[in-house]
Curated annotation (Swiss-Prot):
Residues 65-74 have a biased composition (Polar residues). Pfam families: tRNA_deacylase. This is D-aminoacyl-tRNA deacylase. It catalyses: a D-aminoacyl-tRNA + H2O = a tRNA + a D-alpha-amino acid + H(+); glycyl-tRNA(Ala) + H2O = tRNA(Ala) + glycine + H(+). It comes from the Archaea. It comes from Methanococcus maripaludis (strain C7 / ATCC BAA-1331). It is an enzyme of class 3 (hydrolase). Monomer. One of its GO terms (biological process) is D-amino acid catabolic process. Its EC number is 3.1.1.96.
Amino acid sequence: MDYLFISSKTDPASQNIKKHVQNYGYNVFELEKKSTQSNFSDFPDSEMYIFLSKHASESKKPTLTVHTPGNLTEDNSHGGNPEEISPCNPVFNTLMLQNINKYNEMEEYKELGFEVSFEVLHHGPTDLKTPSAFVEIGSSEEQWQIDDAAEIITNSLIDTLNSIQNSEYEEKEKIIGIGGGHYSPKFTKLALREEYYVGYLTPKHAKLSENILNQLISKQEFDFVGIDWKGLYGEDKRKYVEFFDENDISWQRV
């Protein structure tokens, strides 16, 4: 699998991670604009696009996250096209999360106090033709500048890509996760327990259209859709289950 590391000159965390990635001899493709405002035409062809990025939140909680980009609704105020999602590689996303967690728990990094989690689909770019992921340091200016956080991300990238390129990972079921909050606690936990390879994630508050449901099942390899039964509204559960049943898509409560 060939891959492209992408950084943005507008993003301090991205610049921090880029520096560490380059220290290990890797090339990084640099954008003048925000990564979220990029699109397919900005990049050379690659089998995997990996965005080195900041994560921002009002809580300013120290967090290291992984997610695939995409807009689940008509709102594209953070880049990309309305109701469009980029392809997803659940093996990359899950191994990356597990490796971040592994390094984060090491003695030399433990005291940084970072949480590790997935995020649901949100923001651009949405028109990529091959899988992509954002790997992020959050959630404030203070954390974006931490060298050890960038080192955790860099070491995790190297381990993840080596595992994939050498096929040194176990065969497990691949899933799409629906329901729960923005940081997808249920599916983060399943991934860290090494139960499944978790790919696309969507939150409780998103009302998924048939268009998005069709993209979820066509742009990612998966064995079944996992539904966070307590993490969805009743009417949405009924709608999604009906769609999956009508299309012979395997689903399970999780």
